[in-house]
Amino acid sequence: MEKGGAASLQPGSNSDDDAAAQQQQQDIPMYFVSVNKVPTQVICFGDQCSGLVATDDAKPVVLVIPGNPGSIEFYTEFMREIYEGLKGKVIVWGVSHAGHVAPPKPMQIPNVEDHPTLYSCEGQIGHKLSFIKQYIPSGAPLILVGHSIGCHMVLEILKRAPELNVRKAFLLFPAIQSLDACPRVSIINPLVTYLRPLTVATLSALRLLPRGVQNLLIRLYIFLATACTTPHRSSLRGAVNYFRPECLMACFVFTRDIIQNVRERDNETIARHADKLTVYYGQNDHWSPVEYYDDMRRTFPEADVRLCERGFRHAFVLDRGVDVGSMVRGWIETLLR
């Protein structure tokens, strides 16, 4: 789909959604577009667009880049809070990672085994750059919001596309260094490598269960992994994608790649763009511990580096998306004055 066209725009519910789930999604401006030949789920809050191409190149575009797994549906309430809180002063868009969300029929995700480079970390960075160049006017003020591994992608966008009019970049709970040293890697790594066929087969079989049972299993997993007891329904909808083998495979390729390759923090890019960055670390973050915050403060004493004092978890989108969205909305409001 070229800039200005809308031929590939598709409604956002996936092929397995039942009537109740579709009803819940009616108020979410969700679509699928083709980016690098991969059907990609996007959410677009804002009336200044024509088929997802910005028509007002003076209005700032807030672009949200997710963590992993990368369904942008996890971020629905976070994005809505930013958009509604700023009363239409900005456009708020979010783009899923390539292959992480099942598109509606007849669209299909390119086979992961035949096209692994589409779903690697490098492929996902290229996917975000292509989305920006395809749908956002080159002169439009751009505010980047990355979460977790999405922060790594934000830094890569700043490095690789200096022509973009990036006004600000917010890095939330950044996973930008030493991912192989994180404590959960010892559990995750086998699941995405030699146990991958068994993991994919087992989780894919669960899609045959009724949606209510799937949601119960998702809630149980979320509780065991994060201690969250009240995940928002948008989190449940986003998680259902990972009962699909093609989405699991894309997610696993990406996970393995970032564990292997996201090691050294890109101090050069951070230094070059320090005036544009706000970096927000968590108090109890297994992907980015407080020691990384301390080191960032020592290395960049003049940068805007903050430590969470409100008890937000790394996976804040599960149940605190509105609260974190309100915080980010306040930061953006200050920027717009």
Where are these regions (language model features)?
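Gly/Ala-rich beta-loop-alpha elbow adjacent to hydrolase catalytic centers
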Residues: 145-150, 154
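Acidic catalytic loop of the alpha/beta-hydrolase fold
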Residues: 261, 283-288, 314-315
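Active-site loop/oxyanion-hole signature of alpha/beta-hydrolase fold enzymes
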Residues: 97-143
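Short, surface-exposed "cap/lid" segments of acyl-processing enzymes
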Residues: 36-109
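Short alpha-helix in the alpha/beta-hydrolase fold that links the catalytic acid
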Residues: 77-78, 266-267, 275, 289-298
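Flexible "cap/lid" loop of the alpha/beta hydrolase fold
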Residues: 159-201
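Catalytic active-site module of serine/aspartate enzymes centered on a nucleophile-bearing elbow/loop
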Residues: 275, 301-337
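Short beta-strand/loop motif that positions the catalytic acidic residue
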Residues: 273, 279-281, 285
